[in-house]
């Protein structure tokens, strides 16, 4: 069971964007960082375990020649083996900062080739894999950046082509050196999923076709792809074969966020229907089939939920953001 805990106030409410919450836990300092997008700015907050806000910072998109400031599409902390970077995507490009947002270490501008003349340019979908950071674009390409152990010498090393429509989300999992193991999945506006193996050159392993609805959020855990769709469904696929194992009518409206607690296999789903659900994933050791169990449901009354994340790898607490809601809601186990 979960209960509501002290919420964290925001200067501005969260924008109505999917995956509009990023969480970075710092156990050594007993702190949790939260990142939320609102229009042309991203709010970064630090909070103590009991939810007491300790610091706030606002980040803005690198200015260009435009009349109005460009909108931010996502903010996300990328945890690499040797450093943590904060990545911000927008209608103008990709910005990478040190983890506290104090120093921008890299800027990548989107070029006109990233979109047609009638389509807005933007980047969206952020994830870290080994020493790479992968970012999706509106053209369906995934940009792979090679990240050094320190300093600003970040290099665009590869562009992955597997999608024809804008990228919505990217998820990764550490493959722990296993050859041939899928460790990244990308999703797009048409619902297509691409499963990849990272490395000096990324390899497309499986392409899972869509079925006419977008896939706003995706996760990867122990060879299981969890995908949340615009019709409220959560589908679980085998990453190696692309086979559909489980289909859940989880929500009544578009799913806005999925998250995983990797140490226990808990899956969190949140949607515009005001509900947040927690599920337990498992792979049957005898049959190899994927199994799922519903663990908890939480109604965020009168709120269009746009972001939700676990706050620890055991899934014992989670946080939620909502459109026009000027606070981050927190829940913890009783």
UniProtKB/Swiss-Prot annotation:
UniProt entry keywords in alphabetical sequence: Cell membrane, Cytoplasm, Fertilization, Membrane, Repeat, Ubl conjugation, WD repeat
GO cellular component terms listed in the entry, alphabetical order: cytoplasm; plasma membrane; vesicle
Database matches in InterPro entries: WD40/YVTN_repeat-like_dom_sf, WD40_repeat_dom_sf, WD40_rpt, WDR54_beta_propeller
A Pfam family hit: WDR54
Job description of the protein: Plays a role in the adhesion and fusion of the sperm-oocyte membrane through its interactions with IZUMO1 and IZUMO1R/JUNO. When cross-linked to form dimers and trimers, it has a regulatory effect on ERK signaling pathway activity in response to EGF stimulation. Colocalizes with the EGF receptor in WDR54-specific vesicle where it sustains the internalization and controls the degradation of the EGF receptor after EGF stimulation.
Description of its domains: WD6 repeat is required for cross-linking by TGM2.
Protein name listed in UniProt: WD repeat-containing protein 54
Source organism of the structure: Mus musculus
Lineage start: Eukaryota, Metazoa, Chordata, Craniata, Vertebrata
Gene it is expressed from: Wdr54
